Amino acid sequence: MHKTPLEISLKANPDQKIPWRCAVCGFVFTGEKPPKGCPVCHSPSYEFIPEKDRQQLTYNGEKFDIMLINGSSHRAGNTGYMADLAEAVLRERGVSYRRFNLSEYVIDYCWCCYAVRAESCAYPCRNKKDDMPAFHAMLAASKAVIIVSPINWNGMSARLKVFLDRTTCMENLFHINKPGLTEGKVAGILVQGHEDGAIKTAMDIWLNFQQLGYVLAPFGIAFRTHGSHFNSVTDREFFQNDELIVRHTRGVVNNVIETMQLDIGEKLKGKLVPVTE
């Protein structure tokens, strides 16, 4: 499975006291290992990552196939488990990919430049100080995206919503008569949660990518929920012993790969009529 920064750092510095930051709430603890749990938000120890001077995310320009995005505030929780399952298929199929847990990055809210005037919202984004410009460039460079999302109040997480809001500058290219960067790319959507809201969450996410010109892979959405009548503390055991979440996740990732390999984007180039809001 994907090695976390925590696991890599522990192996390299087994006895060194370092600061550990909770990726959920930002609490910092100093020690040889992270605490057993966060005293502020009660997240387990695997949500801690080694704290270091922040460096802005950059993109080296190297082309790759698929972006795998974990949109949960809990980088190693149940949504992270679903992302792990997806990542295993990507490795097995030998496609090039990059995985991102959004809680590890700094993504500011959208400035809504479009509300001032349409031409003010353009690519590259005017906010160049956070990690989103690199994400923009990778969305343009990759062939497909797989979004893994939790269900929060019958919708996606706030982190993922802000990420998707920040793709407005790419969508708006079609409105200001500039060449688009995303039409014909492929999308797949994976959703998990404690209770209801899976279909709505998936559709909210899909609407964003549809407006960017993405093509949803056939059978490109999968979701799994546990149930409100269970205590949420039992969710992790349920998901990690559930055969359906494994089968459906693997199916969606396979379908994204197969659709991507048809080179639909290249075949549709110059033939699409952008229809966006």
What are these language model-derived features?
Residues Q16-I18, P34, S103-V106, E183:
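Short metal-coordination and nucleic-acid-contact micro-motifs, chiefly zinc-binding Cys/His arrays
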Residues K33-K36, G80-Y81, A158-V162, K200-M203:
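Generic recognition of short, well-ordered alpha-helical segments
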Residues I176-A222:
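Short, glycine-/small-residue-rich phosphate/pyrophosphate-handling segment
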Residues R21, G37, Y109:
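The −1 position to Zn-ligating cysteines in a subset of zinc-ribbon hairpins
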Residues R21-G31:
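Short Cys/His-rich zinc-binding micro-motifs
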Residues H226-F239:
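Short helix/strand-capping connector loops at secondary-structure junctions
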Residues K33-S45:
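Cysteine-rich micro-motifs
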Residues T4-P14, G26-F27, H42, P50-N177, ...:
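N-terminal beta1-alpha1-beta2 submodule of the flavodoxin-like/Rossmannoid cofactor-binding fold
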